[in-house]
Amino acid sequence: RQAALNLNINLKLYGADMAGTAPALVYCDYTRKVCSMHDKEYIQQLIDICVADKIDVLIPTIDTDLLILSKNTEKFDKVGTKVLISKSDKILICRDKNNTGEFFESCGLKAPRTYNNYKNYPGPYPCFIKPKDGSSSTNAFKVENGEELAVYAGQISEYIIQPFVSGREFTIDIFCDFEGNPIFITPRERVQVRAGEVLKTMICMDKVMI
């Protein structure tokens, strides 16, 4: 919003939510209700909103919505709405942590080895188990021994197991244009985290990460 003011652009923000209670809606000029992303009418409801409100750009804010939106970008294009989103193959790399690990290896980056069956995990402990497509640290557990691992594995349908790695953690925000070219890159240290969400962060313009 501040950028639009600086550029003298007339900007109106619309927000959509299932319950109409999402905290971010307070920053929107107008709000709309939509069904669950799992509902077969989800995409059509969003398209109807985009048509009625003449939405220029749709910006997803929840990672669970990314794949379905990416697969339907052409439908939004037809009504004049651009979805600010990556291609489906890139989203699949990020959403499935098995694919993420394989991608890191293909780039020559170090990453903890991933296991999909607790019976095959050789150690060491502690280790970490979490859903392969999870978010917000839901059903993510630090495990101290094999007995604990078996218990947690029984509670998660599709999981990954990795050796526990401690250290400083960074997120790198990359703002790109519609062709995927980086406009600005901002590394930041996750100083304090709760339920997978950052409470306190510190920008660190490190040239190696950039």
Residue ranges and their predicted role:
Residues K12-D17, R113-N116, C127-F128, F141-V143:
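Short, hydrophobic beta-strand segments that form beta-sheet elements in well-ordered domains
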Residues A22-C28, K119-P124, V151-Q155:
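Short loop/helix-cap segments at secondary-structure boundaries that form the rim of catalytic
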Residues L25, Y42-Q44, S86, L92-D96, ...:
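Short, charged, surface-exposed secondary-structure boundary motifs
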Residues F141-I210:
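Phosphate-binding site of ATP-dependent enzymes
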